[in-house]
Amino acid sequence: MGENLAGRAAVVTGGASGIGEACAVRLAADGAAVVVADLNAGAAAAVAGRIGGRAVEVDLAADFDAAALADQADILVNCAGLQHVAPVHEFPPEMFRLILAVMLEAPFRLARAALPHMYEQGFGRIVNISSVHGLRASPFKSAYVAAKHGLEGLSKVIALEGGGRGVTSNTICPAYVRTPLVEKQIADQARIHGISEDRVVEEIMLTEPAIKRLIEPSEVPELVAYLCSAPASFANGSSYVLDGGWSAR
């Protein structure tokens, strides 16, 4: 850790908890001025206060002001997400729309707002927190898998458009991370399958990775910090997988 991001402004969505919180803390440790953007205003304020950042309450599913949030960002980390577990024939259409709005449309709108400033200065870093489910599918997660696959495509298009102008765009694709979102999934999967939560972790979440554990939130931001750094200027348009060997199958 150091001050290699001093003078840079970073926006982290979903920054009040889980991976987003860990990313906000890590980027601040590298000297960035971090905006912690989250639906939970109190939690965002707590994180921002701890790292000397600024909290912004935002509902990414609504008609939020993307320019006000991101048009001066040098670094954009799209991390906000939610999950709903149900078979396709029972999946509520309104929940499908909500998940795509937060996890695909909002990253598009924020990138669209941030890119003119990034292009003007010849520097920008967009890191999209995707998932192994941006590369693979699992039953009962149609909206989440669709949103993450879409985010992979969006990130690559931005990479192609921005690469020659000093702007890079990449995704990070973790397996299951020990976050509130995953804890809720464990409970939902236990209900759907009629098994204990411990069995969900062992028999559903950890069957594919060769490394049999959940990822800790603090592990993901180390890669985020690298991708935001000057030495990562040639890292562009890629999907960086942190899945313990899942996608090696």
Description of each model-found segment:
Residues A80-H84, G245:
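Conserved NAD(P)H cofactor-binding loop of Rossmann-fold oxidoreductase domains
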Residues P87-V88, P92-L100, I126, M205:
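Substrate-binding pocket helix/loop in short-chain dehydrogenase/reductase
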Residues H89, R136-A143, G164-R165, K212, ...:
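Active-site loop immediately N-terminal to the catalytic Tyr-X3-Lys motif
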Residues F108, L115, I211-L242, S247:
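C-terminal substrate-recognition "lid" of short-chain dehydrogenase/reductases
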Residues A111, A147, S155:
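Active-site helix of classical SDR
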Residues S131:
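Residue(s) in the substrate-gating loop at a strand-loop-helix junction
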Residues G163, T168, A235-G237:
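Short, small/polar-rich loop/turn modules that mediate ligand/substrate recognition or access, typified
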